[in-house]
């Protein structure tokens, strides 16, 4: 929980969280968006292009959002207008997004000073904000290594020093999404389209319009996540920059049970595990094994006592023992496996959370106007 690790975790959680918010908007309207990864890819390229073209990182933010929206528009045409299977359309978006940005890089970045077929020139830097009056006191407390208190000081330092304005914008989008989707008539109608579209249609709701709006917003958010990677996380566009974060964002949606708060928690968890493996390698990831073992024990007890599922509890308990044995007999995790930590965490969390999930009732279900007749 050092300040550096927390700061890195925050930066790694933002693109996952933005992609997850995009998936949340789309799926709450009943459209599965597997194409988040492709929309993020478009956001990384268009974000870099916009920042270079207009010499402003904020122009890159807008361009990244537009790039993601373009990918979302294709997805909406296919799924909402023409009724194409959502999974097929999303996979196509992912494939097309990668190929299209590679072509654009050869066309635009190749030949620029510092650019090439796989990367852009360095991009204009995004501004940061710090609460300077807190830095020295928190640094002092963190250096004392007091139990809990120093860890808390490290967390506070990580989230109050050198935070980009883009990060603050991304964080604010979480409560804003909650307010729009759960506290406004627009959000109520949109969620109705994902739960009971036929009933919504019978009440005069234009289901097509709301599904289109949700998918476009989904693309905008995913594009913002991609733009964050190129503008803030790296300061440069690189081919393959997203690294599967669109898929992890979709996993964060599922982990959060299709709610913004849970989604933010999932993004923070995945970002933190990613930061551990990047900053401190196998030793820190090894320490996570004990946490995982204790978590599995708690799940086993819950399955046995509350759910009366003896077989499932036995399997979970055996896995917990196996994880603890690995922790006890080793001192570190081989470097070859540390890079897989975020993805392994994703799989583990989803397997544990799957028992309490409730997706929107009409998520992924084809809808045609007039079905109620």
Predicted feature descriptions by range:
Residues 56, 158-237, 260-265:
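Helix-loop-helix "hairpin" substructures at the membrane interface of multi-pass membrane proteins
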């Amino acid at each position: 929980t050092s300040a550096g690790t927390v700061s890195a975790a925050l930066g790694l959680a933002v693109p996952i969280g933005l992609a997850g918010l995009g998936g949340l908007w789309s799926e709450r309207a009943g459209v599965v968006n597997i194409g988040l990864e492709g929309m993020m890819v478009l956001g990384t390229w268009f974000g870099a292009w916009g920042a270079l073209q207009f010499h402003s990182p904020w122009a890159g933010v807008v361009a990244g959002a537009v790039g993601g929206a373009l990918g979302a528009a294709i997805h909406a045409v296919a799924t909402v207008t023409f009724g194409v299977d959502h999974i097929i359309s999303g996979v196509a978006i992912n494939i097309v997004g990668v190929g299209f940005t590679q072509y654009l890089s050869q066309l635009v970045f190749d030949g620029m000073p510092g650019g090439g077929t796989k990367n852009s020139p360095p991009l204009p830097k995004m501004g940061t904000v710090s609460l300077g009056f807190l830095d020295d006191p928190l640094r002092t407390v963190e250096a004392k290594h007091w139990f809990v208190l120093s860890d808390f000081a490290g967390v506070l330092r990580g989230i109050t020093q050198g935070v980009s304005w883009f990060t603050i914008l991304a964080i604010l989008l979480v409560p804003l999404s909650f307010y729009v989707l759960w506290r406004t008539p627009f959000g109520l109608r949109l969620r109705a389209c994902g739960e009971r579209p036929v009933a919504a249609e019978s009440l005069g709701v234009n289901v097509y319009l709301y599904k289109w709006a949700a998918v476009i917003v989904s693309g905008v958010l995913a594009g913002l996540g991609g733009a964050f990677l190129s503008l803030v996380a790296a300061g440069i566009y690189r081919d393959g920059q997203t690294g599967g974060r669109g898929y992890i964002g979709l996993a964060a949606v599922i982990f959060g049970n299709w709610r913004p708060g849970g989604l933010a928690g999932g993004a923070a968890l995945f970002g933190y595990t990613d930061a551990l493996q990047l900053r401190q390698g196998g030793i820190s990831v090894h320490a996570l094994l004990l946490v995982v073992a204790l978590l599995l024990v708690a799940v086993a007890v819950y399955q046995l006592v509350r759910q009366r599922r003896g077989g499932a509890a036995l399997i979970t308990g055996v896995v917990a023992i196996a994880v603890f044995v690995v922790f006890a007999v080793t001192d570190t995790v081989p470097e070859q496996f540390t890079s897989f930590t975020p993805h392994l965490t994703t799989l583990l969390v989803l397997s544990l959370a799957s028992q309490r999930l409730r997706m929107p009732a009409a998520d992924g279900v084809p809808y045609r106007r007039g079905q109620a007749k």
